[in-house]
Every structure is written in C-alpha cells, then in structure tokens.
C-alpha cells in the first residue's frame, strides 16, 4: 500500500453531529433508520455527497470534514476529506468534492478499508486501529446498515441512496428519531439550491416550516415598558406591610463557641439602611454616582447595598481577597465617588489606600460599617474625627432619602474579564432587578414562606439575585459562616438545620455543598445555578435533596442582569429517571419570561439558525444591562439594536400607551430599546426550542464557575520580561478536569540564563521537548506564576506553563493550537523525577518532616492533579496546582482520625493545614467488586467449559462410531429427548404425521416420570395444551424412562441392549434455561448429550441429530463476520464454521453448554458419527393456531410493550421461525442428513426475517394504542412504569436484560442455511411437500399469534380499530383449561 492514505488521513477530524443522549460507554450502538425521498428528481451522487458535507459543516462548525463513501454498491469504501470555508459556493463545493472523489478512487489499492487502518496503526506504532470516520454517504445496497467492518471506526450515522430514496441509519443511543427526521428535512432543503449553484453554503436557510413554531420569533414585543419599580422601594413596601417578619438571619459558627445567631426584621433593616442612604446623600453622593463596597458576607453587606440604592447611587463590590494591584484596577474602572468598608472585611492594603488618596476623587466614606449585637449601626471613625461617622445621621432613620429612580437608572456596577488585562465594568439598570421575580415565583413555586441563602461570591453579580429575590417576595435570607461554607459536609448540615428552601449557587459552591455531605436536606425545593452544569453535579445534589428542582440559569451575566435562560431538572422524587437519558452536560434551555435566546448564523446575521446548526447566541430582552462603563465602541459591538424589526415600532407603541402616573419615573428612562446582547457563546437549538451551548466564539472560558478571559492571561504573560511568545488554552487533564495551560517561548537574554537549569537528561527523554522545557525552565515557571499572582485572581493562574523552543504555526501563520500537546502522565512523572536537583533533595532531607507532615505531604501528592517534583514546608497547596474544589478530596481521609477541617484553613496564607490527616488506600466500591467477581467468574466459566469439553472429548467418547449411510425404508424407530417441551412436542407431531404415507415411524420418547403410563400422560397433556394431540399417536409411542446424565441412562444391560438395538435415529434436545450457569446445565446438556450419541456406537447403525441453538453464536465476532460475508455477497455465517469465534465471549450458561456439546459432538464426528447438528433461533408459535410458549422473551416484549403503550424502535432482524417449521427442519435434517459422509450443521433462519420494531409494531396494525419510541426513551418509560408507578409488567423478570443494551443484545448474525434447504428438498420424497424455501414470521403471522394470546388471556383485546382485522383461531376448551392451570409456559429447547 502506498503512503497516500497514511498522509491523507493524518490526524483527521471525526465530526460528531449534534446528539440528544449521553454518549454511550464502550461505543455501544443501537441501529435506527429513517427513509425520505427527494421529490425534485434523481439526485446526482456526488452532488448529494456535497450536500451532506455542507450539512455536516453547518451542524458541527468543523472545517475539516471526513466522510466515508464508495464508487458503487459492490466496491470498497474510501474516504473523502474536505476543508470547507464559509464563503464556498455550492458550485465550488461540488467541484471540490468531484476532484477529491475521483482522485481517491484512483488511489484504492486495497480490498477493504480496514487495510488502511492497519497500515496507519503499524506506521504510527499505535496500540489500536485508529478511527477513520464516523459518518458515511454511500450507494444503496442489500446489506446497508449502521455497523461497519472497518476496524477502529465507529459509525454514528450513514446515508444510503439510489438518487431518489435516502435511508439514514443512525445510532439511536445518540440521536432521537425526531433529530434524524430534521436532518432529513435539512438535507432536502439544501438540495433545493441545485438550481442556483452560486449560493454560498453557509447562507442557505435551514429552518423548516415544521419547527419554526418552536423557535423564538425575533420580531415580537418583549414588554419594553414593563418596569415594575425599584427594588429598594419594593423592599420598603414589604417592610411596611410585614414589619415584624424576619428578613435576615446570621447563623452561628459551629467552630466558634462564643458566636450566636442574629435575627433582623424587615422593619429593623429599613431603619438601618435609611441611615446609610441619608449619610451618602448628605455627604455629596449624587444620583448615578458609584459607591464601592469592600465586602464581607453578612447583614452588613445587605445594609450597605440597599443604603446605596436608597441614595439613588450605583453600588459595586470588591472582594478583599483579591490582590491589591487588582483591587486598584477595579477602582480605576469604577472611579467611585463613595467608599464603604465593612468592618469584617478587614483593613485596606496600603497600596490600595495610596491609590485612593492619589488617584480618586472620593467625597463620601464609611470606613468600617457594622451592625452591633444590640442592633445599632456604626460606621467607624473618619481620619481626624472623634465620633462615629454615622452618629449625626441616626436621626434620619425614619426619613427616607426620597431619591426617585427610573427603569434606566443604574443601580449596579459589576466586573467581567477584560481581554486587554483590564476588567470591564458593566452598568446595570433598575428595570431588570425586579421585573422577572413575579414570573420566577410562579414558575418555580417561590413565595414569602421560603428561606433563601446567600452563598454566591461576594464580588460576583449573582449575589444580587441572592439578596434581591427574598427582599422582593418578602421572604427570609439565611447567612452562613465561612466555616459552614468551607468545611465539606457542613454546608448541607447548615441548610438542613435552618430549613433552607431555595439556594443560588455557582457550580463550584454546589460541589462544595455535596462534598462529603451525608445530611439530607428535605426542605430544599429549588436550586439555582448559572454555569455549565453536568449530570454528575445534579445527581450529587439530588442525592442530598430529593425534593429539589435544579434550575440552570445560564447567561446570568453582568451584561444580561436577570435576563437569562433557564433549564429545569425535575426533582428525584417527581421523576427518578429524568436525568437518565440527558447528556453529560445540561442544556442552557430557553429564555425565561420575555427573554429570547437567538442562535444566529455566524455567516449571515439576517438568519437565525435551524435546529442543530451551530451559531452565535444573542440574548434579546428588555432587561439587558445599560452597557460597559466608558467603552462606547465595545457597547456598539456587544449591545446591538435588533436588526429583525424597526425599533421605531416600539417607541410609537410606548408613546401610545404612556400613563400620566409614570411621569416621575420616566424622567429617568430612555425610549424603548429593542437590543440584543452578543454573548460570544456558540450554541444550537434542540427541536423543542431549547438551546445547548457548544463552545465560545472568542477566547473566554469558564472553569469551576469563574469566567476567565484567556486573552487577559495572555496579555499579562506577554508583559513578563522573559516571555517572547505565549498562548493560553483550556485542556482536559487525565481526570477530564478543564485545566488552564500556557505555552511560552522564553526570550533569549542574559537574564534568562539565571533561570535555566542544566540537566543531564537520560537518552530516552533527551528528545522530548515538553519534558526538557518543564525541567530546564522550572525556576522561570515559578517566577512567571509569582508574577501572575500580582496581576490575576488565583483561579486565572495557569496550572501548567510549558516552555517551548517555538510555537507551531498552521499554513495561515496562526498558532496551530491542536498541535500544542498536553503533558501526559508519563511526561509529568519524568519531569517530577528529573526536577529534583541535588540541592532540592538535600533540602528535603534536612527538613526533618514529622510523621504527620509526611502523611500530609503524601496526601497532597495523591490529590494534586500534576505531581510536583518536591514538596517543602513552605509550599502552598494551591500554588502546587490545586483549587478549592479539588481540596475537598482531602477530606475523604479525615474520618480516619475523626477530625473536621474547614477549607478556610487552606486560605489566608494558603499554607498546609495544621491538622492530622490520615491516608487510606483506594478501595473498590462494592459494585466494582461485584463487577470484577462477575467478569472473573464469567471468564473462568467459559475457560473451564472449554477445558472440560476437551477433557470429555478424550475420556468420554467411544473409539469409533459406525453410522447409517441412508435411512432404512419401511419402518424407522426414532429416539427423542425433550419430547414434553414446546419444540419437542411439535417434533413428535411432525415425525408421526408428515411422512406416514411413506414411512412407518415409531417414537421412543424419553420422559421424566414415575412410570411409563405417567410419562405418556405427560406427553399427551403437552400435546393437548398446544392443540396438536391425536390419541391415535399413543400406539406409535414408546415411553423410555431413565436418567440421561447417567451412563446407559441408569438402565440395566438388558434394557439398554433392547433400546440400542431398536433405534435407527437419535434426537437429543437439552434443557433451555437462560438463568442457570454452565455448572448447573453441564450434566444434562453436555453429559446427557454424550450418553445419547454414545448409543450410536452400539451394534445397530444410527443417524444422530442434535438440536442446538444460535445461542452458540452469540458473540460480537459472529455479528461482525456476518457483516463482512454479506458485504462479499454471501448469505451469512457458514454452516461449516467451527465455532472458534465463540470459544470465548458467550454470556450465559445456556449458550456455553450448547457450545461445549457441539465441540464434543464434532470430535465424535471425527470418529465416525454421522448426522446433523441443527441450530434454530427464536422458536415462534404454531403457524396455524398461534399456539405458543408464553414464557418467551419475544412474547413478553409484545405484552410488556402493549402494557406500556410504547415499543422500542429497534431495527435488528429477528430470526424467529414458527415452531412447526423448526420441527420440520429438525426432522428433515435428522432423517435426511445433508451429507452421508460426515457430520454436518444446518441453520434454521427466517425467510423472511422480521425487524424487531415491525414485530412489536404489529400491535398498532391490529388496533392497539401503541407508538414507537427511541430505545433510551422507552427504557426510561418502562423503568418509571415498573419502579416508580409500581405497575405490573410482563417484562419485570427480564428488566435487567431489556434495560441494559437490548439493541446490542438482540443483534443476530445472518445465517447461511444451504444444508437445511438441501435436507428439506430431500425430505419432500417422504412428505410430498417442498419447504426448502423456508418460512418466517410477517405481519399476518403475527396476527395469528396475537389472536391466540388474546384468547388465552395473555394479551388484552385491542381498544381501537387497526388497519388489519385479527384472524379467528380455534382453541379447544380442554386446551384452555390446561393453559389457565399454568400449562404451556415452560421453556423451549432452543432460543
């Protein structure tokens, strides 16, 4: 093979189309299909391929598109790889496709595409075959399917076409049927441009008429003039109505014995904040001035904020934990006229004090605001003053400042990251602070009875929601201590103790809430979070609070204020299975009341995107923030006038609706503005209008709840004197945690040498640039991190900084980010080892760590994501690459020494906590232990069964077997085991009725019974149960008693001799049981089989027939082999296959016992045994009356689906054959073996095979109220039906099986049945009937089964009228009596 494919397929992008469900583990797939037609004539294949490529580009945003295709139905697959750009026209795309397609056909020098995969694996030294594609577009053919035989590749979606008809095969575990239907509609919509090939591919409108109603209309009114009033006035109104109601509760610290709970009523707080408001107003603060608050979580913050608002000013908050240099940056942006320091926030750093004195014009200051235990408010003494600054203003506590504000007055200044290293200040509006609360109260069941928490970051704008929501509702606000927040497990205790009902948390705080928590919080019913929310986070929270509804309010930004999206996750109590089929990351949802999320085409802003198409998210609402402070150009770029509608429309409407009572407020408002905020986030619509976020259009990211501007990090990095080039990315580490990593190129200078360590690298690592850079420049990395600490918040400092000789560039001259490697575990381990200099090692030895300190050091090494070279006493847990969420893992060890360690102990100086922390080895959970034991037992059982089979084939077989060459004419004696089973009874029927004109057959039936009379009665009863018994058979049946598991069945020599000298043909069937392990089935199914065929070694020559099962083929090997054979134009698995493909991997004892028996029979065949092994699949009911074994998987599926009203839309072929035809094949192959020279195998396969969903869907055709559902949806509905609603279901005994991976478990290989057809043809000379064409189960046959099942009471009658009428079937009263008594529900002899 040439190197063309090796180069062509180097590092391909395997596009994943937008999907609906969590990506399945182990690449599981469930095949679903959808067919549509293109009405505008036949579509040229290459044009269709171009349309598909364009659709993939639009739905994924990937520019590197990789699709598998073919030249015709019978030619090898090959890959077409395209680089698409948004300006491409369809004419250019078709030309590009045609060139690639025709060139790549000429490069096909292989028989199968797997050869290319093998070649790449060998050339690159990979452990496994690489994936070459996930999507394909191919010519229609007879074996089209989702599964691919290309090793290493997993196909998610495939389109097969003949030019007019298009069939999509898709993984139903990834995509809902509705999603695929939409893809088909969008494909058809894209083909309409064929008449205008100059259309740009990125500008074709993808919204179909059917889904337009579910997507937001960007032209409707969003209540631009719906101002509800200022939050401070609403708060005052609540205080007047309910003065004695508790407003704020500051709770006691569990670590401070002298602390106490403090309660503040609405009336008390109003008095205090009026004092603050009047002080600010009287000391020079004017409407719209900014007042900066140095904050601390407590009632003091609430008083300061509301006091600023009462003065008509704008409040902004600084967290004292920020570095002083960064505090100064915030001050430089805000330019405040007033300052309020909370006493508990501590004193200002001198650097900040100097900046305020020298750079700001501050007219009003409250230096140390505090509410004392007696309820009095103090503000601290100003410089040079003798009295408290608020003393003279206490008299105003009953006289509000009287400042009137309007909807466009600016109450808040919040900060967000800045790409130039300077945070941006965002001015909020009063319109937003209260507008959405009435809707939220109704939608999320909030009221004045709720108890809210204040847990958001004190300098982050979500804390506004924490405070203002309860104040609007007249509810209560609970304030925790830092110890409650910082100690894992205690936050849950605190919530439960104080009865918190509603909480707003960042994702990071939510993780702290669930970390090590054991206390349930039944009172909590609403949990609001604004972040990328994962299923794991939801499950953790709901394990603590089963009544909690989690509401993700994404885009709760400073820029959008309260105008946000929401997605509600139902509580575990309301719907235990709700989360099961959601993806790992929760959707962003849809806009709340009068808020729209518009996903806009990035290449044509006049269009909103279609379902699934990647676009940029704009938030349209009346409640957007005013804009960025002092940044008019940025405001113009981010706060954009809606271009979908004329803005004058709303101005005219507002003027017409103006009321005279609004005059004072309108003084402080502007005209209605229909604006959109350009979020910079990429997203796509679901079909129901919900939005999922799928990345950023810029370089802003969110880690652990903090929004970080990568450009800001890079700006500061570039200003370090020893950094020449740099770029910062977010990559996932080995634990799938998002990690900040910066790549730098050091600036060559004399100073650089002082930061360079000359290391003697081992030969193995001498060529690894990552290891060399991290080791040689470790001192430079420390210096850079120290430098960044002074410029950035701690969460924005890169965890890893990788020095490189140069940054890789792509052909466009930009940094080639995909080629920037994340150091793997082996590299980091090498760095840790090589970084320990002799000085470091000596210093570590001289530290003389105590046993406790050694334990703590080892614990840190266990927890830290990237192992450091050394840890000294002066190192910080956080400086070594950790963060507060990761810190909670340390507390998994605290129970060993019975200590509680508040996370706050890591902060402050951020040194090692001074607490004894024990270590423990990782122990597998009980579930993991059970899984390991099961897998071990399964592997052992299969290996043991194989070993025992080999041993028995040597020790238990006769030296030789002399067999018949052909069936004797006239009288034939047949020995049958399993005659009282479902299939066995029909074999007896066939033997005694089908050939009675040409053969005189007598049946020797082995029956387990106390006497021959009792045995005959058992046989008779079985025949009557299934409606097939003829009393005339009794004289043709001889009952044989004995134990098949014993040699000679336990008979004496005389009885054994009489039996063996009488028999011409031996039939053996075995116990069918899906639960018993191999060890329980071995004696009967394996040893019993040996004892039966050893009869063939006695004096009289015999044929031998063994009824096996396709269960012996139930491994992935045969499913894949079947696909390969069908692709080669063959019929399926050969009857000559030796079954080595299932020598391992069979999942149940029944299949293992069949495999073992077949293995031993083959060895006997090598010693002369003649006859046939016959393998049926599912044995269905009697074709004439529908008589069935009701304890059957397929019939349970039929009944269970009817009960549920849903059936799984699984498109696997089902190899089910009516029992009378299976019996005919078994008797034909026994009496007329396919070969007289050797032991052979015959497959029983359906002609035709019915699809699984068509079989279950037959119910609808006959009048049942039932609909198809994607498998994940069906499993959730079934689980809810059985478990939550406690309803009886026919599927209850099989619940573990049907809920696991039914589509994969019911996938069966296609089978070649040439030998079966040959025997049936030969048998026609006896029967007069030629059944060599085979039989199967179709819609009409299923109707017979349904009628039978209704008549015996297994199925209810249909409630509706279907397209087909159920046929009449006859069942005798005697049969019905036996069935009602429990007969007819035994296992059959085959699958």
From Swiss-Prot:
Gene Ontology terms, MF aspect: L-aminoadipate-semialdehyde dehydrogenase activity
Keywords: Amino-acid biosynthesis, Lysine biosynthesis, NADP, Oxidoreductase, Phosphopantetheine, Phosphoprotein
Function: Catalyzes the activation of alpha-aminoadipate by ATP-dependent adenylation and the reduction of activated alpha-aminoadipate by NADPH. The activated alpha-aminoadipate is bound to the phosphopantheinyl group of the enzyme itself before it is reduced to (S)-2-amino-6-oxohexanoate.
GO biological process per UniProt: lysine biosynthetic process via aminoadipic acid
Homology family: Belongs to the ATP-dependent AMP-binding enzyme family.
Enzyme class label: oxidoreductase
InterPro entries documented for this protein: AA_adenyl_dom, ACP-like_sf, AMP-bd_C_sf, AMP-binding_CS, AMP-dep_synth/lig_dom, ANL_N_sf, Far_NAD-bd, Lys2
Residues bearing the modification O-(pantetheine 4'-phosphoryl)serine: 884
Domain Carrier: 847-927
Enzyme Commission number(s): 1.2.1.31, 1.2.1.95
Cofactor list: pantetheine 4'-phosphate
Subunit description: Heterodimer of an alpha and a beta subunit.
DNA-binding keyword on record: no
Catalytic activities: (S)-2-amino-6-oxohexanoate + NADP(+) + H2O = L-2-aminoadipate + NADPH + 2 H(+); (S)-2-amino-6-oxohexanoate + NAD(+) + H2O = L-2-aminoadipate + NADH + 2 H(+); (S)-2-amino-6-oxohexanoate + AMP + diphosphate + NADP(+) = L-2-aminoadipate + ATP + NADPH + H(+)
Protein's UniProt name: L-2-aminoadipate reductase large subunit
Coiled coil start-end: none
Keyword Amino-acid biosynthesis: yes
Bound cofactor: record note: Binds 1 phosphopantetheine covalently.
A Pfam family matched in the record: NAD_binding_4
CDD domains: A_NRPS_alphaAR, SDR_e1
Protein's pathway: Amino-acid biosynthesis; L-lysine biosynthesis via AAA pathway; L-lysine from L-alpha-aminoadipate (fungal route): step 1/3
Gene3D superfamilies: 3.30.300.30, ACP-like (1.10.1200.10), N-terminal domain of ligase-like (3.40.50.12780), NAD(P)-binding Rossmann-like Domain (3.40.50.720), Nonribosomal peptide synthetase, condensation domain (3.30.559.30)
């Amino acid at each position: 093979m040439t190197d063309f494919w090796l180069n062509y397929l180097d590092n391909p992008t395997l596009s994943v189309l937008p999907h609906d469900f969590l990506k399945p583990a182990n690449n599981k797939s469930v095949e679903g299909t959808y067919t549509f037609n293109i009405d505008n004539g036949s579509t040229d294949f290459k044009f269709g391929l171009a349309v598909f490529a364009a659709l993939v580009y639009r739905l994924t945003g990937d520019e590197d598109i990789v699709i598998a295709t073919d030249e015709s139905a019978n030619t090898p697959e090959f890959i077409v790889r395209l680089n698409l750009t948004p300006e491409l026209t369809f004419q250019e795309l078709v030309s590009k496709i045609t060139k690639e397609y025709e060139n790549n056909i000429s490069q096909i020098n292989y028989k199968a595409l797997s050869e290319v995969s093998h070649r790449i694996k060998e050339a690159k030294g990979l452990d496994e075959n690489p994936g070459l594609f996930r999507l394909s577009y191919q010519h229609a053919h007879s074996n089209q399917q989702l599964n691919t035989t290309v090793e290493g590749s997993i196909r998610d979606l495939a389109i097969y076409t003949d030019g007019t008809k298009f069939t999509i095969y898709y993984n139903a575990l990834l995509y809902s049927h509705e999603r695929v239907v939409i893809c088909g509609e969008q494909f058809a919509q894209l083909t309409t441009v064929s008449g205008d090939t100059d259309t740009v591919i990125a500008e074709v409108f993808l919204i179909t008429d059917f889904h337009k109603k579910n997507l937001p209309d960007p032209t409707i009114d969003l209540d631009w003039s719906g101002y509800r009033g200022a939050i401070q006035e609403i708060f005052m109104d609540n205080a007047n109505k309910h003065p004695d109601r508790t407003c704020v509760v500051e709770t006691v610290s569990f670590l401070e014995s002298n602390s106490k709970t403090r309660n503040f009523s609405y009336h008390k707080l109003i008095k205090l904040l009026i004092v603050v408001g009047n002080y600010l107003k009287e000391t020079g603060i004017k409407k719209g001035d900014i007042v900066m608050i140095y904050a601390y979580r407590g009632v003091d913050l609430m008083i300061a904020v509301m006091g600023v608002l009462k003065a008509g000013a704008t409040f902004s908050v600084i967290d004292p934990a920020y570095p002083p240099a960064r505090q100064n940056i915030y001050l430089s942006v805000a330019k405040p006229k007033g300052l309020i320091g909370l006493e508990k926030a501590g004193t200002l750093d001198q650097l900040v004090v100097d900046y305020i004195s020298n750079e700001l014009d501050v007219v009003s200051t409250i230096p140390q605001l505090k509410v004392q235990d007696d309820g009095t408010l103090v503000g601290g003494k100003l410089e040079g003053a003798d009295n408290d600054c608020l003393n003279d203003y206490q008299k105003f506590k009953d006289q509000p400042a009287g400042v009137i504000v309007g909807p466009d007055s600016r109450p808040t200044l919040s900060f967000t990251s800045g790409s130039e290293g300077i945070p941006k200040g965002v001015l909020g509006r009063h319109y937003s602070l209260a507008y959405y609360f009435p809707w939220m109260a109704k939608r999320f069941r909030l009221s004045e009875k709720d108890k809210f928490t204040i847990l958001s970051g004190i300098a982050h704008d979500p804390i506004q929601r924490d405070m203002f929501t309860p104040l609007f509702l007249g509810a209560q606000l609970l304030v925790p201590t830092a110890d409650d927040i910082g100690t894992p497990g205690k936050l849950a205790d605190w919530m439960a103790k104080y009865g918190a009902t509603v909480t707003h948390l960042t994702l990071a705080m939510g993780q702290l809430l669930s970390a090590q928590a054991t206390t349930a919080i039944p009172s909590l019913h609403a949990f609001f979070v604004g972040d990328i929310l994962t299923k794991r986070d939801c499950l953790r929270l709901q394990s603590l609070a089963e009544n909690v509804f989690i509401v993700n309010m994404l885009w709760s930004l400073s820029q959008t204020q309260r105008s946000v999206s929401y997605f509600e996750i139902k509580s575990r109590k309301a719907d235990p299975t709700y989360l099961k089929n959601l993806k790992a990351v929760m959707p962003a949802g849809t806009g709340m009341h009068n808020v729209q999320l518009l996903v806009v085409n990035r290449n044509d802003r006049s269009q909103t995107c279609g379902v699934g198409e990647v676009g940029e998210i704009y938030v349209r609402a009346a409640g957007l923030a005013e804009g960025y402070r002092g940044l008019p150009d940025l405001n113009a770029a981010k706060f954009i006038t809606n271009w979908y509608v004329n803005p004058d429309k709303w101005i005219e409407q507002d003027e017409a609706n103006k009321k005279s009572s609004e005059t004072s407020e309108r003084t402080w408002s502007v005209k209605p503005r229909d604006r959109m905020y350009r979020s910079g986030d990429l997203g796509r619509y679901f079909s129901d209008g919900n939005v999922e976020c799928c990345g950023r259009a810029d370089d802003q990211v969110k880690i652990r709840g903090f929004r970080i501007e990568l450009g800001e990090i890079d700006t500061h990095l570039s200003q370090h004197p020893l950094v020449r080039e740099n770029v910062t990315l977010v990559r996932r580490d080995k634990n799938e945690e998002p990690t900040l990593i910066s790549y730098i190129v050091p600036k060559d200078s004399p100073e650089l040498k002082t930061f360079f360590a000359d290391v003697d690298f081992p030969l193995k690592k001498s060529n690894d640039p990552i290891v060399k850079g991290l080791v040689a420049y470790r001192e430079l990395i420390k210096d850079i991190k120290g430098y960044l600490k002074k410029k950035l918040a701690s969460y924005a400092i890169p965890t890893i900084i990788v020095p490189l000789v140069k940054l890789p560039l792509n052909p466009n001259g930009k940094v080639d980010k995909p080629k920037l490697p994340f150091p793997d575990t082996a590299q980091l381990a090498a760095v840790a080892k090589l970084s320990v200099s002799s000085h470091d090692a000596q210093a570590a030895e001289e530290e003389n760590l105590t046993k406790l300190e050694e334990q703590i050091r080892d614990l840190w090494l266990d927890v830290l994501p990237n192992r450091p070279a050394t840890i000294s006493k002066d190192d910080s847990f956080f400086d070594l690459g950790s963060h507060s969420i990761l810190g909670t893992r340390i507390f998994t060890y605290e129970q060993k020494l019975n200590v509680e360690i508040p996370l706050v102990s890591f902060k402050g100086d951020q040194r090692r906590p001074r607490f004894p922390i024990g270590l423990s080895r990782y122990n597998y959970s009980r579930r993991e232990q059970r899984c390991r034991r099961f897998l071990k037992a399964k592997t052992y059982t299969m290996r043991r069964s194989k070993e025992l089979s080999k041993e028995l084939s040597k020790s238990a077989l006769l030296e030789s077997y002399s067999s018949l060459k052909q069936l004797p004419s006239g009288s034939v004696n047949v020995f049958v085991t399993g005659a009282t089973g479902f299939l066995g009874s029909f074999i007896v029927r066939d033997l005694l009725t089908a050939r009675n004109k040409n053969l005189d057959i007598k049946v020797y039936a082995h029956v387990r019974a106390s006497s021959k009379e009792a045995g005959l009665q058992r046989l008779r009863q079985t025949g009557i149960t299934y409606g097939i018994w003829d009393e005339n058979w009794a004289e043709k049946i001889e009952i044989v008693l004995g134990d098949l598991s014993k040699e000679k069945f336990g008979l004496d020599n005389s009885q054994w001799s009489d039996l063996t000298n009488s028999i011409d043909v031996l039939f053996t069937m075995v116990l069918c049981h899906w639960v018993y392990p191999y060890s329980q089935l071995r004696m009967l199914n394996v040893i019993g089989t040996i004892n039966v065929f050893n009869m063939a070694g006695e004096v009289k020559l015999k044929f031998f027939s063994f009824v096996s099962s396709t269960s012996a083929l139930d491994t992935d090997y045969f499913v894949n082999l079947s696909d390969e054979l069908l692709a080669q134009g063959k019929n399926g698995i050969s009857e000559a296959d030796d079954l080595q493909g299932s020598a391992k991997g069979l999942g149940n004892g029944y299949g293992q016992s069949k495999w073992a028996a077949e293995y031993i029979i083959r060895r006997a065949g090598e010693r002369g045994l003649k006859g046939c092994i016959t393998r049926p699949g599912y044995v269905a009911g009697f074709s004439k009356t529908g008589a069935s074994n009701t304890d059957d998987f397929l019939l349970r599926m039929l009944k269970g689906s009817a009960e549920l009203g849903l059936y799984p839309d699984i498109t696997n072929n089902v190899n089910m054959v009516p029992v009378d035809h299976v019996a005919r094949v078994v008797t034909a192959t026994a009496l007329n073996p396919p070969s007289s020279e050797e032991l052979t195998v015959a497959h029983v396969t359906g002609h035709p095979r019915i699809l699984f969903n068509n079989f279950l869907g037959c119910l609808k055709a006959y009048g049942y109220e039932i609909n198809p559902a994607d498998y994940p949806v069906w499993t959730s509905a079934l689980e809810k039906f059985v478990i939550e609603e406690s309803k009886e279901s026919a599927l209850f005994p099989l619940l573990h099986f049907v809920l696991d991976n039914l589509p994969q478990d019911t996938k069966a290989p296609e089978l070649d049945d040439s030998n079966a057809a040959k025997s049936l043809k030969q048998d026609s000379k006896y029967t007069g009937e030629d059944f060599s064409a085979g039989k199967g189960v179709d819609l009409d046959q299923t109707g017979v089964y349904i009628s039978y099942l209704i008549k015996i009471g297994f199925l209810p009658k249909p409630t509706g009228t279907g397209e087909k009428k159920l046929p009449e079937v006859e069942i005798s009263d005697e049969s019905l009596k036996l069935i009602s008594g429990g007969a007819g529900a035994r296992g059959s002899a085959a699958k």
